Amino acid sequence: MSIKNQIHLNRLPEHIAIIMDGNGRWAKQRGKLRVFGHEKGAKAVKQVVEGCAELGVKNLTLYAFSTENWNRPKLEVQTLMKLLISSLKKEINTLQKNNIKLNAIGNLKELPSQVYKELTDVIELTKNNKRLTLTLALSYGSRDELINTVKQISVKVKNNIISPELIDESVINEHLYTQNLPDVDLLIRTSGEQRISNFLLWQIAYAEFYFTKIFWPDFTKEYLYKAIVNYQKRERRFGKTSEQLS
């Protein structure tokens, strides 16, 4: 039986998030510049988006560019921004054809103006698509997100819009970048690293983690299916005992 046929379609994770890691090391192994790894990594993105859409996964969030990534060499950052623009232009028809909605989270105003415009244009064009919501985390850091959330709520408390006693999880959720997304069910990280890297710290509270040694450029639909099969074999207890769930 193929790995895809082992997936139970009635128990799919509603929200998959991926830390796409290993582009640079993949390129280095082949004696290439890091840029080459990023270009190949863009093809892996297409594979995973197609795989999620075909299965019926409703939400996919990709860690595309962190707040810390601005500290990388200037040429690499410029190349990543150019690659983002070209990918958006190239894939807009595919997104529309497959009923995929593009979303973005992060401090988007920090993006170069051309990138921001292209991104917001595609988001507007695809806003009514329903099959899959593809969220790109760009200029994103979870601590930055939480600081922004606290500031927003603090202003509302100061202006008597929100009472401090009424602040709960739902209020915090409403002020996060991910306010319209469900919590993450499955978090995947490629390249063998086993850390979170300041990604969706609030939203992964009950997520199942899946780490693979595969570098991101080599990550195909089959590896996605393998991660989902592994996820479906786990017992998600949310603080309860196995006996309570049975």
What are these model-derived regions, one by one?
Residues 1-246:
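Flexible, compositionally biased loop and terminal segments
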